[in-house]
C-alpha cells in the first residue's frame, strides 16, 4: 500500500519510495486503489490460429487430415491481426504459447509469442523459446477419426498410434545419429538418410529440444501416456 513502482526501459527499477532523479518527461500514472501484477503467461492458447470472431477463412488450428501431423507448425497459421490479441492484452496476458487444436494424436508444433502488435508472426516470437508439441488423447482424436470411419476410433487405438509414432521417431533419430557419427570417408560410401519433417519434430522431443503439451481429460489416460 502507498508505494510507488518505477519502470525504466521496460524493467522495474524500484519499488517503494519513488526516485528523486527521474527525468522531467517521466510519465506518472495514479494507480491508487488498483493492483499491479506481473504479465500473465498463457501456456495454452489458440489466439491467431482460431481468431475471434471466428470465420472459416481464418480458422487454421487443426490440420485434421491425419492422426499424426507433427510436421505442421502453429506459427504458420497465426494471424497477427486477430482482435483477440488486443483483448488478451487488456486482461493482462503478455506472452502465450500458441498451439494447434486437439483433433489429432500429434497436432504439430506450438510457438511462444509476445503479445505485441506486429504485421508478422516473426515479430511476435519470444526469443529463444523452445518449441512445444501439441498432443491430444481421449475423446477428441477418437471422435474426429472415428466419425470418418478411420482410426483411431477408440482409446486403445489412440495409444497404439502414439506407440507406433514414437517407434518410428526413435528409428529415425538413431539412423541419423549413426550417419552423423561416420567419418568423411565413410560418408562417401554411405547413403544419407532422408529428411522427414514429421519424424524430425518427434525426434526433437526425444532429444529434449521440443516440449510436449498434452491435452488430456482423465487421470488414467495421463498415466498411460507417462508409461509410454
Residue locations for each model-derived region?
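Histidine-rich, glycine-flanked metal-binding segment
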Residues: 1-37, 54
Amino acid at each position: 500500500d502507498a508505494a510507488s513502482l518505477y519502470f525504466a526501459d521496460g524493467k522495474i527499477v524500484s519499488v517503494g519510495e519513488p526516485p528523486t532523479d527521474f527525468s522531467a518527461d517521466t510519465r506518472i500514472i495514479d494507480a491508487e486503489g488498483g493492483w499491479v501484477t506481473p504479465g500473465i503467461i498463457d501456456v495454452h492458447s489458440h489466439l491467431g490460429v482460431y481468431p475471434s470472431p471466428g470465420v472459416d477463412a481464418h480458422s487454421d488450428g487443426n490440420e485434421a487430415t491425419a492422426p499424426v501431423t507433427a510436421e505442421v507448425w502453429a506459427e504458420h497459421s497465426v494471424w497477427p491481426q486477430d482482435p483477440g490479441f488486443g483483448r488478451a492484452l487488456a486482461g493482462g496476458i503478455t506472452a502465450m504459447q500458441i498451439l494447434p487444436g486437439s483433433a489429432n494424436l500429434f497436432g504439430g508444433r506450438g510457438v511462444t509469442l509476445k503479445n505485441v502488435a506486429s504485421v508478422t508472426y516473426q515479430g511476435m516470437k519470444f526469443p529463444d523459446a523452445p518449441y512445444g508439441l501439441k498432443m491430444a488423447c481421449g475423446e477428441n482424436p477418437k471422435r474426429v477419426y472415428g466419425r470418418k470411419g478411420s482410426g483411431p476410433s477408440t482409446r486403445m487405438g489412440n495409444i497404439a498410434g502414439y506407440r507406433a509414432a514414437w517407434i518410428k521417431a526413435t528409428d529415425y533419430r538413431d539412423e541419423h545419429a549413426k550417419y552423423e557419427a561416420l567419418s568423411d570417408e565413410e560418408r562417401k560410401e554411405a547413403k544419407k538418410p532422408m529428411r522427414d519433417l514429421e519424424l524430425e519434430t518427434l525426434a526433437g522431443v526425444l532429444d529434449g529440444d521440443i516440449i510436449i503439451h498434452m491435452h488430456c481429460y482423465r487421470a488414467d489416460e495421463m498415466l498411460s501416456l507417462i508409461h509410454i
